[in-house]
Each structure stands twice: as C-alpha cells, then as structure tokens.
Amino acid sequence: MQINGVKIKSGYDGKIISVIGAARSGISAARFLTYMGAIVTLSDSASEEKLGAERVAEARAVSAKFIPKATVDEALPENTKFVVTSPGVPKTAEVLQEAVRRGIKVWSEIEFAFHFTMAPIVATTGTNGKTTTTILIAELLESAGLTATIAGNVSADEIKLTLVDAAWNSSADHLNDEEIIVAEISSFQLEWVHKFAPCVAILTNITPDHLNRHASFEEYVETKARIFAAQQDDCLAIVNDDNEAAKNIADGWKERGYQGKLLRFSRNKVYDKSVPAAFVENGVITVRLEAGGENVAILPVSELPQSLPGNHSVENVLAASAAALFMGAKPEAIARGIREFKGVAHRMEWVAEHNGVAFINNSMCTNTAAAVSSLSAMTRPTVVIAGGV
C-alpha cells in the first residue's frame, strides 16, 4: 500500500487485530492499523456514557469495529493475530490475561509504533523529570538545526501526539534524515514491550509511585528498566547515578544482559576517564560519550536559566545534554538551547512577581520526591499553597 506516494510494507493486510482501550493512544493505533489494511476491533470495558460523547465519536470515526462495554470474547475475536493495549489498561485486566492464556501476543502502543517507524527515537522515562527532560531534549535538537517531534506520554497542554502518530508520520511522509522522535514514556507503556529499542533511552530517577497499579516498588522498578532491555550496542542508555534505584539498574547492567552503551549522569560525582558520563566539573556541565574519550564542556551551571531551578534541573540538563550530543548536536547549540529554554507549564513555572513576592505554579508536583526537589530549589522564604487528595 502507499501513503503520500511512499510504499509501506505493513504485513498487517487482512490480519485480525484487537486494540484494547478506546483512549487517545488506542484510537490512534486502531486508526493506523486500519490504514495498513488490518481488520481491527477497538474495544473498551467502559460504557459509551462513561467514555463520553467526544471519545465515542472519535472511536466511531475509525474504520474499525468499535465495541464499548465489551466482553472478553468480543474484545478477542477468533483468529486474533495480536493485541495492542492502551497504557490505561492494567496488566491484570481480564482481557489481557485471557489473551496471554490463548497465546496471543500483547503489545503496548509504543511497541506497535516501534515496529513501523523510520525515525530514531529518544525516549525518557522515570518517576519525575520526564516531561521537562523530553521537551528540553527536543529544544536542544532544534537549536542544533535538527528536526524533533515530541510525542508519547507528555503531559504538556499543547502536545497531544501519541508515539503511534509520530511513528506513522515518519513512515508516511518522506522522512528527513535528521528527523528524530523525542518521546516521554510511562511505566504503563513499558508493561508490554518486547523489541522496543530507542536509539537513546533515559532514566531520570525512580521513587515510589503508581503503587496502586504496580504490585510492589520492585515491580515498578523492573517495569521502568524495560526501556533498556532490547537496546543494542549502537544505542545509548543514560541513567541517573544519584538515584538509588536507577543506580542499582546501572550497577547490574552486565548481569541483566543489557547491550546498550551505558552512560551514567551525576551532579555529585566526577568520573574516571574510563566511564562514559555526564557530570559537573569545576561548575561546568560536562559530557563524555566514550570511555577514554573527550570531555565536552557545555555551559556553567551558573548560567542555567530561571526556568531550570534547583538540583533536579541540573540532573535534567545533564541527561538532556548527553542525549542531544549523542544525536549530533554541537556543544554550542546545546548551550544556546539551554539558555533559551522557557520551561514547561505547571512545573516550577514562574507566573509573576508582585510587591517582592514571586508566584510559582508547580501544580504538576504530585508525589513526595517531586515536592522535596521543588522546595529544595527555593532560595527565598517560601509559602506553599497545597491541596487535593
């Protein structure tokens, strides 16, 4: 088949495929599977009323059989080749467990996207710092004259592109050789990955979170670690050496059988020349991509903009700088992109100052570790207005 004059070999023509979950990513996957010639069932356990009129209209606009309030058998038609599941559907869901029991392959939507994208993927996961790091990487690449598309689980208001959308665009449009997909990836999206191997994978940190979804903190950690599992030796894995859970993953790299080239980052350590790393040396953000390689100075920490306050921002900048350098950005372009970074809405967002009082919107701070990092970044007496349960 051809899209925009580009021949696409999908391998999905006439295949029966089930998409579980009629949320944004599920609808996106169903839409593109039908474009590829698959026979698609899009189902959700929720009723039309619970899904809402807008979501139902989007689902019905897809050339797939849409089944709200679906039973397991309705969601898994006979001869289903594989299942694509939305991140909002837990691993323990009866329909997914039944698919496994029947020997049907289950893919997350990012696994599906990876199978047909033609663009390299830079993927960031972690408990905190994902969105800022993702958007910062994209802006650093753009500063270097590269083309970056932000996609995935990004919670910024203006970014609604799923990884499937971005991957499809890279296949359907005559791909610019410099186009790069920069994606934020949640633990939910990593539950059903098998061959997903981003060109660069970043782990910002891991602290207890989402334990209503994951059976234990240990399971949550192992799910996050799956972002590295299929990487090959031409891929880069960037891991926070200052975070205990992330460091433990890095320390067990060979034992886990991981193939990706490991680069540790730390705001507290200066590394021996034998270690690929990103670190602060003499007050300067520094990256060394290769063991025994050159130390590349990016910019002094003192020159980080107001939009990147606190120690946690130094960590984000270290990771983003290493990723951008690996993808071909020059140090001076990276430094320029950092200086010009405007920040992300709802994350230590400077709103205004009145009568000497600064007002900062940090409403995306939803767990203890994020709250501690944010408050530690404050250099003036601080009053916190907090609420919610």
Locate predicted features:
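Thr-Gly-centered strand-to-loop micro-motif
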Residues: I20, S43-S45, T85-S86, A151, ...
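N-terminal leader/targeting and accessory segments in enzymes
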Residues: M1-S108, F112
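Phosphate-binding loop of NTP-binding sites
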Residues: T34-Y35, D73-T80, P87-D241, A245-Q259, ...
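Acidic-glycine-rich active-site phosphate/pyrophosphate-binding loop
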Residues: I137, F279-P300, V344-A352
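Nucleotide phosphate-binding/pyrophosphate-handling subdomain across enzymes
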Residues: N4-I16, S28-M36, P300-V389
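Beta-strand->loop->alpha-helix junctions that form or flank phosphate-binding loops
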Residues: T41-D44, I67-A70, W107-E111, G152, ...
